């Protein structure tokens, strides 16, 4: 019986091998071809879906963009590790110095103002039209860069007490630059009023010369008017706000930013507040500015404006780009959504700028230092476990001759404590 079993098993094995070979020869080529086709089709679909999915979740622009203006927006949101560890909160900063045209948050504003003017027929590329603007520097740099890219000229008016490297850069970009003595907004020689008057004179002279057949000055003059132009806050409503919301997955407790024109704080607040009603919006205000009292007490006033004093600068601070002593349309657009304000002295801004270099390797501009100081104060007020977002508006490279000249060099062996920053005092 066992021998018969062995014979049976062996015969069955041989028969199986023969049948397998026969089946392979008869049917396998067709099956193999079908399998190859199936795999090819589904592999292609998987690759296409993966490509679409990966692009959908990327934080950043497409791999290839059209011109320098395509490099604006979609900036990273970085965690400032030292401040997060020191406060127990997550302090995040929008790296606006990575915008690709003028390397500041003003790239968004400049592009928005130009596009709105084009839509309204106020400017035409390559027609000789000139953009005029009154600015402390960053908006002018962004406008000058984009003007060249889009076929315009730029004429920038700025206070003469701003860092010289800003006007030098504007000249390298081909802009005409007027450095005018600081003056109140009510005076015609104020840098904003001068830009407005020059734009109007340009347009009027072009029209007059056209009627008599001369053309010494081509095109029209367009006054960008960043303080009152709604394209300012809309740039942040359409760009900065949605980016922050997406990068935070809709979860943040406070947004902190300085205000000069007011476009950033208003645009971001107008976008985020309806979606995150319980979040806090905080203005970071340098010394000499009246916005702190405007938010806290409803009155635009600073103690440095008391009767019998006359300040050399519009806002008595070494901080550039934020702080103001008048109401602007852009700030008023979102003022009711602003919950609080933090006053930051020059000494505190300088100490924070040095801290960011020492602890994080972040070389921040003056307004960015003010923002980060106010973010820390907000974090300490809210308590551990909260998420605060602020802005790194531009780098320190535009503040070398003034703000960073005062801040000095950061030594290699320095070990600053956060208390030193919070309690920083002016040198006597």
From Swiss-Prot:
- Span-the-membrane segments of this chain are 7-27
Q: Which cofactor does it need?
A: pyridoxal 5'-phosphate
Q: What is its EC number?
A: 2.5.1.47
**Which reactions is this enzyme annotated as catalysing?**
O-acetyl-L-serine + hydrogen sulfide = L-cysteine + acetate
Instruction: Report keywords, A-Z.
Output: Membrane, Mitochondrion, Mitochondrion outer membrane, Pyridoxal phosphate, Transferase, Transmembrane, Transmembrane helix
Q: Which residues carry this modification: N6-(pyridoxal phosphate)lysine?
A: 106
The answer on whether this UniProt entry bears the keyword 4Fe-4S reads no
Q: Which Gene3D superfamilies match?
A: 3.40.50.1100
CDD domains for the chain: CBS_like
Cellular location(s):
Mitochondrion outer membrane
Q: Which InterPro entries match?
A: Cys_Synth/Cystath_Beta-Synth, TrpB-like_PALP, TrpB-like_PALP_sf
Q: Where does pyridoxal 5'-phosphate bind?
A: 260-264, 367
Care to name a GO molecular-function term for this sequence? cysteine synthase activity
Domain of life according to the entry: Eukaryota
**Any idea what job this protein has?**
Putative cysteine synthase that catalyzes the conversion of O-acetyl-L-serine (OAS) into cysteine, the last step in the cysteine biosynthesis pathway. However, in contrast to cysteine synthase cysB, this CS-like protein seems not to function in cysteine biosynthesis.
Please report which protein family the annotation says this sequence is part of: Belongs to the cysteine synthase/cystathionine beta-synthase family.
Q: What is this protein called?
A: Cysteine synthase 2
Q: Which organism is it from?
A: Emericella nidulans (strain FGSC A4 / ATCC 38163 / CBS 112.46 / NRRL 194 / M139)
Taxonomic classification: Eukaryota, Fungi, Dikarya, Ascomycota, Pezizomycotina
Name of the gene: cysF
């Amino acid at each position: 019986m066992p021998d018969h079993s062995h014979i049976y098993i062996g015969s069955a094995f041989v028969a199986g091998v023969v049948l397998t070979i026969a089946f392979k020869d008869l049917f396998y080529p067709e099956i193999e071809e079908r399998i190859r086709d199936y795999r090819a089709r589904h592999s292609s679909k998987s690759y296409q879906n993966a490509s679409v999915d990966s692009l959908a979740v990327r934080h950043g622009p497409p791999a290839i963009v059209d011109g320098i203006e395509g490099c604006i927006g979609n900036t990273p949101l970085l965690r400032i590790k030292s401040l997060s560890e020191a406060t127990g909160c997550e302090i995040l900063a929008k790296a606006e110095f990575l915008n690709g045209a003028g390397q500041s948050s003003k790239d968004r504003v400049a592009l928005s103002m130009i596009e709105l003017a084009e839509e309204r027929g106020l400017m035409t590329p390559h027609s000789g039209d000139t953009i005029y603007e009154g600015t402390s520097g960053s908006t002018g740099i962004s406008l000058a860069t984009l003007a060249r890219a889009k076929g315009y000229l730029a004429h920038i008016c700025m206070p003469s007490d701003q860092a010289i490297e800003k006007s030098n850069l504007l000249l390298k970009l081909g802009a005409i630059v007027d450095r005018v003595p600081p003056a109140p907004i009510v005076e015609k020689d104020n840098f904003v009023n001068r830009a407005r008057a020059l734009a109007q004179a340009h347009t009027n002279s072009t029209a007059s010369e056209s009627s008599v057949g001369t053309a010494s000055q081509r095109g029209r003059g367009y006054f960008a008017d960043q303080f009152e132009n709604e394209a300012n806050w809309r740039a942040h409503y359409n760009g900065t706000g949605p980016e922050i919301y997406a990068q935070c997955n809709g979860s943040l407790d406070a947004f902190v930013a300085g205000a000069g024109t007011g476009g950033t704080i208003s645009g971001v607040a107008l976008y985020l507040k309806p979606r995150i009603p319980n979040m806090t919006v905080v203005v970071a205000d340098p010394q000499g500015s009246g916005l702190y009292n405007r938010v806290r007490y409803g009155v635009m006033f600073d103690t440095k404006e008391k009767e019998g004093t006359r300040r050399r600068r519009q806002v008595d601070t070494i901080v550039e780009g934020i702080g103001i002593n008048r109401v602007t349309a852009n700030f008023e657009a979102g003022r009711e959504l602003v919950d609080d304000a933090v006053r930051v002295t020059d000494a505190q801004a300088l100490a924070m700028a040095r801290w960011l270099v020492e602890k994080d390797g972040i070389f921040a501009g003056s307004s960015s230092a003010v923002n980060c100081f106010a973010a820390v104060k907000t974090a300490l007020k809210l308590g551990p476990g909260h998420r605060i977002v602020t802005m790194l508006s531009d780098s320190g490279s535009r503040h070398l001759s003034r703000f960073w000249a005062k801040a000095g060099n950061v030594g290699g062996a320095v070990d600053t404590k956060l208390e030193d920053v919070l309690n920083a005092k002016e040198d006597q």
